[in-house]
Design a protein with these regions (language model features):
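A short, basic N-terminal segment
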Residues: 1-53, 259-261
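Conserved NTP-binding/hydrolysis module of P-loop NTPases
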Residues: 17, 96-115
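Walker A/P-loop nucleotide-binding motif
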Residues: 49-70
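Conserved catalytic segments around the Walker B and adjacent sensor/switch elements
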Residues: 55, 78-94
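Sensor-1/coupling segment of RecA-like P-loop NTPase cores
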Residues: 59, 143-145, 156-180, 190
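Conserved P-loop NTPase "ATPase switch" module shared by AAA+ and STAND
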Residues: 124-149
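Conserved small helical "lid"/interfacial subdomain of P-loop NTPases
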Residues: 192-222
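The conserved phosphate-sensing helix
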Residues: 230-244
Length: 263
């Protein structure tokens, strides 16, 4: 465990390898992940075909899907055709029931609650009908209930594409096979690869700079960082865990050396 005192003594202002809770702290030099954002933004502002209001983005485990989903949902997307599109992020591992899905949308929009799913849907549709804003649903994982999402996207087709959905999935063979009727709305399918070894190494270095260290390579061994990036096998999650363990080891070794010198 690295204490705040340890970090300050090592010339950091914060832990460089903890997960960012704010999606604005996004490393922009991961080519595939940057492309995901560009493609998704294009989908969000495209109102040409009202039938196509569902996008699927598929990537390998640990490739940054959650951060990308949160970043897209956190953004406010001005649209010349329909005002502003606001995003709602949902992790479908925690949204376990259909009513939780609808309740999440109602709560995020600040609408009155209801005990009926039908009333919840009607409340959402009435709000969007009377509002200049659009709604972007960003699902981190497969949809919990396809029926309600299908109903929302069907309504959107007849109402100037006011509801759009982006779904982030693990990149598997025939990812959308189980989407059933939702495939009729599919207007975007974009698979992306994991970051390269060099990209991960650059990310780890940049995180140290963002955490306040004036010269990360004076503390971290460059080859060790490249080895961590290589052993992560494309997983950003694994790379951050291993880098954190490496930093803790370095700090402990430095503390022991200082203790011996002070005797």
């Amino acid at each position: 465990m690295i204490s705040t005192t340890d970090l300050v003594n090592a010339k950091f202002l914060e832990h460089p390898f903890l997960r960012y809770t704010d999606p604005r702290f996004f490393f922009p030099h991961l080519a595939e992940q940057r492309k995901v954002l560009e493609v998704a933004y294009g989908f969000i502002i495209d109102n040409n075909d009202p039938q196509k209001n569902l996008g699927v983005l598929a990537g390998p485990i640990g490739s940054g899907k959650t951060m990308l989903a949160m970043k897209l949902a956190a953004g406010v997307h001005p649209n010349l055709d329909q005002g502003v599109t606001h995003g709602i992020y949902m992790n479908t591992n925690t949204v376990t029931e259909p009513r939780h899905f609808l309740m999440g949308v109602v709560d995020a929009l600040g609408l009155p609650s209801s005990r009926s799913n039908a009333n919840r849907l009607e409340t959402i549709f009435d709000f969007l009908s009377d509002s200049p804003q659009g709604l972007l649903l960003v699902l981190d994982g497969p949809p919990v209930n396809q029926d309600y999402l299908h109903e929302m996207l069907s309504w959107s087709v007849e109402n100037k594409k006011r509801i759009k959905a982006l779904v982030f999935l693990q990149d598997l063979y025939e990812t959308t096979t189980n989407f059933g009727g939702l495939n009729a709305f599919l207007g975007l399918y974009h698979p992306f690869r994991a970051p390269s070894i060099q990209e991960i190494a650059n990310l780890l270095y940049s995180r140290c700079k963002l955490a306040g260290h004036p010269d990360p390579l004076s503390l971290l061994d460059e080859q060790a960082i490249l080895n961590i990036a290589s052993e992560a096998h494309g997983s950003l999650t694994t790379a951050l865990i291993q880098a954190s363990q490496y930093l803790e080891q370095l700090i402990e070794e430095k503390k022991k050396r200082l203790t011996i010198m002070n005797i």
